[in-house]
Amino acid sequence: MANQKKHRWLPYLMVLPAFSIMVLVVVFPIVNTVARSFRTTDGRFTLDNYVYFFTSAEALQSLLFTLAEALTVMALSVVLSFLLALYLRFSKSPVSRALGKLYLLPRFIPGIAAVYAVMNVIKDSGSINRIAAAFGVDYKPGLLYDLKGIILSNLWFCIPFAAMMMSAALSSVNDSYVESARDAGCSWRDVLCRIILPLTYKDVIVSATFILMGQVGAFTIPYLTGPNNPKMLGILLYQRAPT
């Protein structure tokens, strides 16, 4: 009986360190921040912060701008990453093998260095402009300090992350399922909709959720590549937060 009780508590003891760290690093800051949002500087209860946020034109504009950016990045990242993962999983070409080794490379490049590299490509005097000038075309992309610049910069980070998760999910799809469906006369569209998506949709949702959460709270990329107005929500909160 004593051994049974010991084994029953063993799994909980094993996850306790990780759970404690999560509570300390994630849960406590969130609860503390929410609690402080209902207080004034002298500790009294107030709803003024929420009244200001939902009645301020600047705050609402920032919220809508952030949601537009986050949803766009999420949608593009999920679609492009899923297509990339499908290609890496089912193609046997040398190109797919090379991409399978290289697509995670952006994850190992320091974030600031990657952002400045993207900026040097998309700015009006950057690589795109110089390539166009070589063909006698004065082309200014107009991507930097704009919503499009934020989206392009974030895709650099989000696509490898989502593709990694989706590739792991697709690796669990047995080749025999696909081959049997093809032998039965199913098109690739039927295979995708009836076999692959039902087996991988949970990982797709998890990837989309992580990307959306990261974009809503993004700071570095919008700070360096975004417009002065409207601002991403993280930039606005940083500028309005008391020091």
Task: Name each model-derived stretch.
Residues 1-9, 13, 194:
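Short, Lys/Arg-rich N-terminal segment immediately upstream of the first membrane anchor
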Residues 5-7, 50-58, 223-243:
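Interhelical loop and adjacent transmembrane-helix boundary motif
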Residues 10-41, 57-140, 145-171, 199, ...:
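Membrane-water interface segments at the C-terminal ends of transmembrane alpha-helices
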Residues 39, 48-55, 97-100, 104, ...:
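Short amphipathic alpha-helical coupling elements at transmembrane boundaries
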Residues 43-46, 125, 169-179, 188, ...:
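Transmembrane helix boundary and interhelical loop/hinge segments in multi-pass membrane proteins
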Residues 47-48, 61, 73, 190, ...:
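Membrane-embedded glycan transfer/ligation machinery
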Residues 58, 95, 176-177, 188, ...:
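Conserved short cytoplasmic inter-helical helices of the MFS fold
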Residues 184-185, 198:
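Glycine/proline-centered hinge or cleavage motifs at structural transition points of membrane proteins
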